[in-house]
Amino acid sequence: MIPRIKKTICVLLVCFTMLSVMLGPGATEVLAASDVTVNVSAEKQVIRGFGGMNHPAWAGDLTAAQRETAFGNGQNQLGFSILRIHVDENRNNWYKEVETAKSAVKHGAIVFASPWNPPSDMVETFNRNGDTSAKRLKYNKYAAYAQHLNDFVTFMKNNGVNLYAISVQNEPDYAHEWTWWTPQEILRFMRENAGSINARVIAPESFQYLKNLSDPILNDPQALANMDILGTHLYGTQVSQFPYPLFKQKGAGKDLWMTEVYYPNSDTNSADRWPEALDVSQHIHNAMVEGDFQAYVWWYIRRSYGPMKEDGTISKRGYNMAHFSKFVRPGYVRIDATKNPNANVYVSAYKGDNKVVIVAINKSNTGVNQNFVLQNGSASNVSRWITSSSSNLQPGTNLTVSGNHFWAHLPAQSVTTFVVNR
């Protein structure tokens, strides 16, 4: 009798353990406070893509294998569809940008470029709040600087890369180590010189989405006509500052891109911290849903705090990005969805290629059983991929669609991407 009792207890323990694994950490279940309603016909912004920066001069170039990991969209690949590169002030260094850019283009990604400094002969120092070594573009060199940017566009084209866009200046309002621009100086360049650039023009790339830099462009018809993409960074920007009513009012026909960030920190070897890495997917969610951004671009692609670690493997932060980048492809459109159906649950939805893609983040310590309802649309089947403390983009079982809705379990401290085939 004793061995049989032990065997029964062991079987029960195994069953309980398996149930705990399926339900996630803590194995506590809650029913979501409300359904997630996905309105397939309520279209928001067109998505250009997700990606990151390659900066050979500062961080070394990506290797051939790392380029595949970054821009390929197979297993153990990030599926990035945007590459940002550096416009070196010295044209003798431009060749360093070519190989990774060509690889990105080969995979269907778009490439854009940002300058930190004009050529040294175009720059002068000035007294900025007591800093006599501050740099700015000489006022009589604006046309020459526009030609410098054009020369980079031409160089890349001659080397097999048609730049999608080029920026006027990286972080002109945080330029302690590069070139400062005042709002008035950027406005002048956008009005008088940006129209001569032979690529889409990005401006003003504020470090913190400070609107005093971009408001003058939006309020000036000529400057606005010469701007194709309003680009910004989100360092320290509160979510309450993500919406931009003036852009909504004046920016018809213009794109809105988030062109650089790392989040939530740049601590050494922080890329695999869990559940901290979930902050990345939540930040992307907020950029898409609260900010209506069309692109989300990380800082260095390969870094100890980035989407790819120095050994070339994808980090937990990278897998959080991949929940968007691998599935929400260029040209997809964000659609309306219940963004916060339960405490610490965040949902966004997109459509394209006859699919609906839903990204659901559960930052709580309990699993959530969530009902998803498709409005103005139907579904034939639902696939899903899950990243948690113990899994990385792990495929889950396909889900049953009943009418126009399906139930799904969102494990504690996890992110799940659902692909709904229509």
From Swiss-Prot:
The disulfide bridges present are: none
- Thermal profile of function: Optimum temperature is 65 degrees Celsius. Half the activity is retained for 25 hours at 40 degrees Celsius and for 5 hours at 50 degrees Celsius.
Q: Where is the active site?
A: 171 (proton donor), 260 (nucleophile)
- According to the UniProt entry, the coiled-coil residues are none
Q: Which GO terms describe its biological process?
A: sphingolipid metabolic process; xylan catabolic process
Q: Where in the cell is it found?
A: Secreted
- Reactions the enzyme catalyzes: Endohydrolysis of (1->4)-beta-D-xylosyl links in some glucuronoarabinoxylans
> EC no.?
3.2.1.136
Instruction: Recount the UniProt induction comment for this entry.
Output: Constitutively expressed.
Q: Name one GO molecular function term.
A: glucosylceramidase activity
Signal peptide range equals 1-32
Q: What is its main location?
A: secreted
Q: How does activity depend on pH?
A: Optimum pH is 6.
Q: Which UniProt keywords apply?
A: Carbohydrate metabolism, Glycosidase, Hydrolase, Polysaccharide degradation, Secreted, Signal, Xylan degradation
Its UniProt pathway annotation is: Glycan degradation; xylan degradation
A single GO cellular-component term on record: extracellular region
Q: Which PANTHER family match?
A: GLUCOSYLCERAMIDASE, GLUCURONOXYLANASE XYNC
Q: Which family does it belong to?
A: Belongs to the glycosyl hydrolase 30 family.
Functional note: Catalyzes the depolymerization of methylglucuronoxylan (MeGAXn) from different sources. It cleaves the beta-1,4-xylosidic bond penultimate to that linking carbon one of the xylose residue substituted with alpha-1,2-linked 4-O-methyl-D-glucuronate (MeGA).
Protein name as it appears in the record: Glucuronoxylanase XynC
Per the UniProt record, the source organism is Bacillus subtilis (strain 168)
Encoding gene per record: xynC
